[in-house]
Swiss-Prot record:
It is found in: Nucleus, Nucleolus. Residues 25-84, 142-197 are annotated as: Disordered. This is Regulator of rDNA transcription 14. Residues 65-78 have a biased composition (Basic residues). The keyword Transcription applies. Involved in ribosome biogenesis, probably through modulation of rDNA transcription. The lineage of its organism: Eukaryota, Fungi, Dikarya, Ascomycota, Saccharomycotina. The keyword Transcription regulation applies. GO terms for cellular component: nucleolus. It comes from the Eukaryota. Its main location: nucleus. Residues 159-176 have a biased composition (Basic and acidic residues). Keywords: Nucleus, Transcription, Transcription regulation.
Amino acid sequence: MSSASAKAQATAAVNNVLSLVLPGSAKIDHNSTKRQNNSKGSKAQLINANLKKAVRVRERDAHSIKKREQRNRRKLQRARQLAEDKVDQQAKLDILRKHREEDSLTAKERKFLNKVINKNVRDLKSWDVDAEELHELQESVLRNTSQRSSLQKRKRKQRRDDFDESKKPVSGDHRYPGLTPGLAPVGLSDEEDSDEE
């Protein structure tokens, strides 16, 4: 018994190692003692097939690694380009500021400066609108949550009141001192109609 379980564990370990080293390789069956080479082909063919599978897996992995590296390179390149553009823009603005202070702006520089100013003003106005919209959104969320919570409170109170009403007895309390429950006093009948007479 122990030798069979040990053999099964060893076979499983070998299969795990083979799957790590040669992905897609055929697993070893621990139940069969003889190899069935006739149905699968010769050992050389099996080795060749396993190597081809391993090469395909490596190529696929290499392709995905290349794609990932290309994506990272593109991200870095975009970040560098943005940083360079920002530095260039700042240098241009410094030159324009210096020319404006010296009153030596050309028509082209004045036009560019006006465009930059208009763009900055537009951006600032759009930020103000966003702040207003954000404030309105916050107010509407607060209104909705307060309405929702008050509605939930009303429903809870209504359910409690309904429960309390259903708990109350339908008829009044007809207790008389000295009598056991369910017995009427002497001279009165159990019927309610006789009370009206």
